[in-house]
Amino acid sequence: ETVTLNNGVKMPLIGYGTYQTPPRITERCVSDALHIGYRSIDTAQCYGNEREVGLACQKSSIPREELFITTKLWGCHKYADTLRSIDASLRRLNLGYIDLLLIHEPSGDVHEIYRAMETAYRDRKLRAIGVSNFMPERYLDLINHSKVVPAINQVETHVFRQQRELRRLECQIGTKHESWSPLACGQNGIFKNPELSRIAASHGRSISQVALRFLVQQGIIVI
C-alpha cells in the first residue's frame, strides 16, 4: 500500500528503518528486508550505513523504480555545504537518485539547508524533500521561508505520543506525517498495556499489530 505525496510521488506506507544497524550487518539486514517484501528503506548520514543500504539495493533483483530510499542530512549549516553533503550521500548510496531527503533535525540554518535541498530537487537529484523532528513552531517557520512545501515530516509518533496538533497543521498545509519509533521503543509498558492487550485479544492480533494499525489506518507512514 502506498500514499501519494504532495508532488504526486508515491511512497510505501510501511518502511524498514536502519537506525542503530551497524554497517557490518546493514547489507544483510536490508537484503533480508527486501526479500520479505519491504520496498521503502530509511537511512541517514549519521547512521553511517548509507553505502551498505545502497549495496543491498544494487545486489537485489528489484528494479530501482520499485524502491523508495530515504536518507537524512546531518551536520549541515549553509547552502554550499548542504549541496556537497547531498552529493556525498548520492555517491555513497550509488542508486542514481534519492527518493526522499529530509533535514534530520532543526539545527543549523534550516532555511539555507532547505534552499539547497530545493535546488537539488529541481535538479532531479531528489524525488521529494522534507523534514524530521520539526515541531509546530519550527515547521511553520520553515513553511513561511520556503518555495517547496515539505512532502514529509518524520517525527516520533505512537499510541502514547500522537502528535495531534502537528498532524492537523501538516494536513492543512499538505505535508504527510511519518512515524519513527511506532512501537514507542518498547517503552511505557506498551507490550503489557491493558487497553492494547484487550484490543489485541478481541481481534486475534498482537499488540504490535494493533499499535501499527492505529497509525497506518490514519494514513500515517511508518518506519
Q: Whereabouts are the PLM-identified features?
A:
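N-terminal binding-site loop/beta-alpha segment at the start of enzyme catalytic domains
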Residues: 1-67, 183
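Alpha-helical scaffolding within the catalytic cores
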Residues: 1-3, 51, 55-58, 86-87, ...
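Short, acidic/polar
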Residues: 21-34, 77-93, 112, 137-140, ...
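CE4/NodB-like, metal-dependent polysaccharide N-deacetylase domain
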Residues: 82-103, 119-123
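Beta/alpha (TIM)-barrel catalytic core signal, keyed to glycine-rich beta->alpha loops juxtaposed to Asp/Glu
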Residues: 105-223
